[in-house]
């Protein structure tokens, strides 16, 4: 590259601003506009793996509030500038970096869509979808599968008395305890307001008892729960039947605690 990485970065930013695709750039000073673009362009010039530099620049832009479409547009502007300078090989590298960035953003969006935003565990839809798949898998391979549902005792009263902020703290704490208790092969999710569930692959009654014991050591003081478990083959052949039986046993446990 005949021009310096710095000069090419300036030209790329101007290109993005002219195209109106890099709208957020207009809010930054000149140094802020460039960010780590010079490092990215220098990596292209040296035939280094430019993707890590592109991702570092993208993370920097994301921290400043840039939308993914603005970041991709800025990287594409770099490609157009290089193309005009006859740097076809570098342009191809830029295009590949944009593809990888879009793939990363798409994967992150897909994963975020599966997560409960408050607690970070699987949301209701994702957990039920996974349960259906695991039931089908367990039936095909004739393996064991257990579903355990949990309900935080007296959560509504605590929420009303101490406020939603305290209620949210309890939900996050219990979700963290569930994640800390589950094995890598297990799955945990939030399936209602204060209801959670765990799916134990190859789980039987002994595994469930051990899981609940470990969970109790992880749960913060002052948090108590009711639980109900159901097992594939325990009169259950579908995920709907598993949830129905686990719910009945959950409320049986809750009633016994209240008696």
Where do the PLM segments sit?
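Catalytic-core segments of nucleotide cyclases and related cyclic-nucleotide turnover enzymes
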Residues: 209-213, 232-259
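Conserved nucleotide-binding and Mg2+-coordinating catalytic segments in signaling enzymes
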Residues: 111-129, 150-163, 172
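Alpha-helical transmembrane segments and their helix-membrane boundary motifs
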Residues: 61-78
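Core of compact, soluble alpha-helical bundle domains
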Residues: 1-59, 85-110
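Heptad-repeat coiled-coil signal-transmission/dimerization helices
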Residues: 127, 131-132, 148, 171, ...
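Short regulatory alpha-helical coupling segments
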Residues: 124-143, 158, 175-183
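GGDEF/GGEEF active-site signature
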Residues: 172-234
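Active-site-flanking beta-strand signature of metal-NTP-handling nucleotidyl enzymes
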Residues: 146-151, 188
